[in-house]
């Protein structure tokens, strides 16, 4: 008689009971996942401390006066604006540099 090969030993058939049990387990997990967000919403409503949010702009400098008055200062630190101001006062190359 022939002995069973290693491939037939490894591939055993699973009983229908095991596959049904897995389906039930998956349904329970899905049900638990669906009910989890409701519980977390209830917990977040009872926050102990208020949440503070700060908004900061990158590469923007503001003085304390600007925060109170919410007005920009007269002196500009923008290099593009300063270059444009110099071009206007000296005459732009498009005009031929003549005043």
Swiss-Prot record:
It comes from the Eukaryota. Coiled coil: none annotated. Residues 23-32 have a biased composition (Basic residues). Signal peptide: none annotated. Residues 1-99 are annotated as: Disordered. Disulfide bonds: none annotated. Pfam families: SPAN-X. Residues 1-10, 64-78 have a biased composition (Polar residues). Belongs to the SPAN-X family. This is Sperm protein associated with the nucleus on the X chromosome N4. It comes from Homo sapiens (Human). The gene is SPANXN4.
């Amino acid at each position: 008689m022939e002995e069973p090969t290693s491939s037939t030993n490894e591939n055993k058939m699973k009983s229908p009971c095991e596959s049904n049990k897995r389906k039930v387990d998956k349904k329970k997990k899905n049900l638990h996942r669906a009910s989890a967000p409701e519980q977390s919403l209830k917990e977040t409503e009872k926050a102990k401390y208020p949440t503070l949010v700060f908004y900061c702009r990158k590469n923007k400098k503001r003085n304390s006066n600007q925060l109170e008055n919410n007005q920009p200062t007269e002196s500009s630190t923008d290099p593009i604006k300063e270059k444009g101001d110099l071009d206007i006062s000296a005459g732009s190359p498009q005009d031929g540099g003549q005043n």
